[in-house]
Amino acid sequence: METTLLFNTSLLLTLMILLTPILLPLLSTKLQNTPLIITTTVKMAFFTSIIPTTIFIYSGTEAIISHWYWSFTPNLKIPLSFKMDQYSMLFLPVALFVTWSILQFAMWYMASEPHVTKFFIYLLMFLIAMLTLTIANNMFMLFIGWEGVGIMSFLLISWWHGRAEANTAALQAVIYNRIGDVGLILSMAWLASTLNTWEIQQISYESQTPILPLLGLILAATGKSAQFGLHPWLPAAMEGPTPVSALLHSSTMVVAGIFLLVRIHPLLANNQTALTTCLCLGALSTLFAATCALTQNDIKKIIAFSTSSQLGLMMVTIGLNLPQLAFLHISTHAFFKAMLFLCSGSIIHSLAGEQDIRKMGGLQKLLPTTTSCLTIGNLALMGTPFLAGFYSKDLIIESLNNSYLNAWALLLTLLATSFTATYSLRMTLMVQSGFSRIPPITPINENTPLVINPITRLALGSIMAGLLITSNILPTKTPPMTMPTIMKTAAIVVTILGILLALELSNMTHNLTAPKQNIYSNFSTTLGYFNPLAHRLSSMKLLNNGQKIASHLIDLSWYKKMGPEGLADLQLMAAKTSTPLHTGLIKTYLGTFALSILILLTLTH
């Protein structure tokens, strides 16, 4: 009883602490927020959240559900239902820890910005929307969190709204996510009309769900988690401030799609078509994003494509019927991805906004803490043994090796893993080693604790998070006890091959001034020609067809046939028909009069 009371109290306290900076200014005009207050609030919420998470793990509880009804239709009751299970309780401290570090970094990065308090409030609301999504126990609450992260991402990506690129990127993010939202809304409509409920527990009992609502949910995850086909918004979102990129890519919006599939996984578990769709889509996404990252020169774009590649790996795990592993990768990925973005932000800020890695070099001596943490982050991303990424990434590739599913997906995933090592090492070498290629008057300084503390804190998380999480969670399925050495070491072998490939390419191209253009480098540089084809060609075709339809239907049909000209022609025809009758001869008029009388008499008698 005491344990339950402590759990409920500490969890409620965590949520109330988070809401305080938003609610207090509404109560009194004298209570004004500052970035420091908001950062301290998230820090306090993180330390408070450790208590319920620890109690939950060690009490052996499966789930705690609380709900109350909000009925605005007589047939469909929609409860405000919250579920504290393994996923939501572990995600809570991870998200708070990462957000605390990002907010502390933003106090330095955005110090000279006007309206900086509003920026921090937006980041906090972004986090709250994501936490609403994770603890939601029905599709209605999940949809509120889903749309919340969508609108907050739009506001944050377009924060520098004076720049046309930022506005375009924000619109792109919204439009691509609208496509995914169509799938979610249609699936929710099917669930409400067929099962008469949006409760996830009740939905999970449906053993044979048709493929169409499942494809709608997969489409929703494809849009939100930037899978192949709806991926261009993710690299474009780099136009926002770096703290936004760090929060968006680590623990909020982009993992919302994968989290949706983890939540509704009982529906997918028995449908092989849906699982195969997830597997193939994820394998294609992870390879395509890794291929695009190979030739990028913008440091933030490289990290953005690495996020897209890791999201593809999570989608592969959903396709393998292992949602717990996908969630484990979400948790470990949050630490090193946030750290990579904060390191890139520190470098960009120190170099007066320069993002091109070809104009960096030799930063190991100038920014030792930042570059050391950047190296740790890249090693964790590669899946280096005993760092955070290893505990999830290695397990995913082991499971893929041991599954009876499609070898094509396995080959694509292994190739993408190799490419991950290649572009990570390329970025590390070009940023940190070699001769310095930065202007000599650039003021470089990383002495402020607002930079060093969050980055080193996340570096510690990138080293220890995998071990801590896997030590406290038991796998839902028994892992294979024995397997061939080649299958066990496949992930590390392809990673080493990728590193060797990067070193060889670095040596080969060290003295080249202009690399030769070929079809493969052009494919990677132009992001697979996807943007010109999707944004230019298809838009031009749609606009031309729309113009033709409008001109033919409206101009020709309405104006010519049925509109003013049509009426004029009709009246002219009537006038021409009646004109010959008006001859001016008395005999004609008398004959017409007599004929009219005769017809009238015939009709009346």
Swiss-Prot record:
Q: Which residues cross the membrane?
A: 5-25, 45-65, 89-109, 116-136, 140-160, 179-199, 210-230, 242-262, 274-294, 302-320, 333-353, 371-391, 405-425, 449-469, 483-503, 583-603
* EC number, UniProt record: 7.1.1.2
Q: Which GO terms describe its molecular function?
A: NADH dehydrogenase (ubiquinone) activity
Against Pfam families, the record matches this protein to: NADH5_C, Proton_antipo_M, Proton_antipo_N
Catalytic activity entry: a ubiquinone + NADH + 5 H(+)(in) = a ubiquinol + NAD(+) + 4 H(+)(out)
Q: Which NCBIfam families match?
A: NDH_I_L (TIGR01974)
Q: What is this protein called?
A: NADH-ubiquinone oxidoreductase chain 5
List the lineage, top down.
Eukaryota, Metazoa, Chordata, Craniata, Vertebrata
